[in-house]
Amino acid sequence: MPKMKTHKMAKRRIKITGTGKVMAFKSGKRHQNTGKSGDEIRGKGKGFVLAKAEWARMKLMLPRGK
């Protein structure tokens, strides 16, 4: 049986917490921020927990849970 490989997109965009939840991070913070308010930019810095329906699929992409 071949080795389980980590999905490279998932490795960069999602994270599995210590309790097993799957977190992602909001987009739209890297550049072109001049028209945005400070509250909007700070809000995009936070992660959010994905819906439980997506957890199983995301965990398949990260077989080692990193």
UniProtKB/Swiss-Prot annotation:
InterPro entries: Ribosomal_bL35 (IPR001706), Ribosomal_bL35-like (IPR021137), Ribosomal_bL35_CS (IPR018265), Ribosomal_bL35_sf (IPR037229)
PROSITE patterns linked: RIBOSOMAL_L35 (PS00936)
UniProt keywords, alphabetically: Ribonucleoprotein, Ribosomal protein, RNA-binding, rRNA-binding
GO annotation, biological process: translation
Signal peptide positions (record): none
GO-annotated cellular components: cytosolic large ribosomal subunit
Function: Binds the 23S rRNA.
HAMAP family in alphabetical order: Ribosomal_bL35
Protein name: Large ribosomal subunit protein bL35
Organism: Deinococcus radiodurans (strain ATCC 13939 / DSM 20539 / JCM 16871 / CCUG 27074 / LMG 4051 / NBRC 15346 / NCIMB 9279 / VKM B-1422 / R1)
Record lineage: Bacteria, Thermotogati, Deinococcota, Deinococci, Deinococcales
Gene: rpmI
